[in-house]
Amino acid sequence: MTSIQERGTSAHLHSLKEGEASDRSSEMLPKQRSIIGSHVQRPPSQTTLGRSRAGSNTMNKVSGLDIARRPSENLLSNMNCSDNGNGGNMLNSFVNSALPPPKVNPAQTRRERPASNSSIGTKTTEVFSSTSASSSLGDTSDEGEGSDADKSKINTFPSILMEKATQGRGANGNGMRSASNNTIVEATTDGSKMALQKSMSFDDTAAEKTMNKSRHSYQEQFSSKKSQSSLLNSKQRSRAKSQTCSSTGYNNSSILKTFGISSKISNSSDRIEASSLEFNVPSQKPLNCKPLTPSQKYRLRKEQSEMNLRNTIKRKEKFYDSQEQILELQEGDVDDSLIWNVPMASLSTNSFLASAKPDDMNNLAGKNDLSEYTGGLVNDNSEISYTKQNHRYSNISFASTTSNASLLDFNEMPTSPIPGLNKVTDFQFIQDTTKSLASVYLHSSNRLSRSKLSERTKSSDFLPIELKEAQNQGMEDLILVSENKLDVVSHSRPSWLPPKDRQEKKLHERQINKSMSVASLDQLGKNKDREEKLIRDETNRQKYVLLLDRDITRNSSLQSLSKMVWDTPFSDETRSTIYSEILQSKTRFITKNYIQPFHELQELLTKMGDFPKNKEIEISQLIETSLRRKVSGLHDICPDLMLLLKIKSISSQGIVTGDELLFHHFLVSESFQNLGLNEIWNIVNLVQMTCFNDLCKEKFDAKVLERKGVVAGYLSQNEEFKDEFNTECINSTTWWNILERIDHKLFMWIMDIIVVNNSQSYKNSPINEDEFVNKDWEYYRSKKVVINYKILISFALNVLLNYHFGFTDLRSLCNVNDQRFCIPVFINDEFVDADTVNAVFIKKWAHYYKKF
């Protein structure tokens, strides 16, 4: 019965094939062969028939469209080679009539790759669906590229077989009615119908079971052991490929079973599961050696990262759950099994050990990274990324372990006995080893802590002043200042303000360095000027001596003297002599003729007995207001000042403005201390009569407020002086308020300048004593005294323009309560040179004096 059925079916299909060959177009047969067996190696008897039915032009057209062959083609080729001629004719006729080829757009010359969203779009989270598995399965054939339409054709293979089988059944029925009543052929046709229907139903059931099993195996594999698929060797991979080819054609195997050739194909469920397992396992490199698309790689990495995260969370939860009973232990209720003989470091050294980063360990880690990179270049992309990731973590752990080990000196450990050979118990061996390890750790940590503390002690010298003050107050220990804190603190910002960021710190450091460079250059210039000034002062002092020897009253000497006095004050040895000679010549004519002798007035004061109380109070109040409350009160006041003022009060001139200042500074000056009160009396009266006489005061008051004068030219330009540009604020009396605020050293220099600018050349025009016999002082003053009010006005102008702060006007200057207020500003700083400040004041004064 079986042989009759086979022969009948073969004959029926052969006749069906001949009948449809004339009705169908020439393109149908190549399309059908492209799905199942367009390139099947047929026996010689079938080759001629296939060529005559299909035509070479149609086959060339299909081959030029780059339509990939299916895995069933190779399978059917093997079966056709082993089958007889009748079986081959029957199979070829069924293939040519049952399966239509895919429709191809004739205008499309190149198969374009589909868009990423359409090629991998899915609603599930699976990396590869059954469709993608089947498509990758089809790509393992001889062709390299296949279209998505061909892959969908393979997946819908059972429905195509059902349709073509129904069409074939109808065609067979028509052929049998036109051929006469042949009972054998009808029986054969009915048998083929039943067999084909059974095969279709079996194929549908088998396909559904296979898909369910593949999904189930995929889920079980990812939930239990993810690394199962990566451990397949090359033999298992090749075996999985062969099983995949057979399992992909499971629909074909059920059809061929109908024709009695099912023994050629193995359609077991175990092999189907193996193939589905192989292709559902996500891996960076597919088995067909084709690279994945970027979207598939992304989904693969996403799935792997999610699985790693889930596994990590499970391990963490499991670890902490197992430790819950340890956390619940109360203090003092500790299990004995939890106590170990482990050496522990103190908190101070533990921080050092944790933060230590040796340079050799960094170099070692860098070399490992380089070797790892160069060694991994021979692998593919997936292996490089996986290897570099693993090596990175291994290098970090190795470097940290080696860095910690390098801090420990294991050479201190004694040689340990060998267990089993020496008579040492295990307990004794473990105890000795732990003691040795503890000693090594403690010694190494102590050595490291000492080195760290020594480094911090050295670096504490460069910390900001605020931190040093905090240490002095017990608020912070500079030895415990770490390197991280040193990075955020800076000398240019107080410690209570937020730290600077790196860019701001660099910018400020650059600006500070620039400012320091400029300041250093300025300081170098100042040092050079100071050295030059010292040399110049010493030279000028020697010149003063030479001028005195040569006659200082000469015209040339006075010119040189007037220039040098602006740079260098008189020395203590030459001051008194220069004053006397340039004001009254060597003959001392004024002292002899117009100044009352000191000893006569002193005798008169003695004869008076009790000095008038009101006069004495006035003198005391004058000393108090003019000296003690001013900058002169910072120094001791000579007791002889009271005597000199009393004598001056009973003299013919009486006490005039400025007497208390002149007597005080001359008494304090070393230039007149050794000369006695008589000489001081004569010098003070000489200066008052020549430099500050009544005529000079009158001219000062008249010229200082002159509208076209120099003072008015400066002060009228500024509206701030409009309230003090009057006779009440600027006059000869308020001029002395300025001198009350002048320091002693600068005061003597000012007197030197005023005296020199009131001198005259007695060498060229000597004093004729006979001319001034029985002449009063006014006559002599009109003939031989220089009235230089300009030097006094320029002095006041210098103060008003450059040092007018701390007081409203010259009249209110005497009422300033600050004793330390000084002109120039009193600076009590050891780094500030008072001589330099005074020299600047004198230079400005000389500048304004040249304007007159």
Curated annotation (Swiss-Prot):
Residues 43-61, 74-96 have a biased composition (Polar residues). GO terms for biological process: fungal-type cell wall organization; protein transport. Its main location: cytoplasm. Residues 15-26 have a biased composition (Basic and acidic residues). The modification Phosphoserine is found at S72, S201, S459, S517, S520. Belongs to the SBE2 family. This is Protein SBE22. It comes from Saccharomyces cerevisiae (strain YJM789) (Baker's yeast).
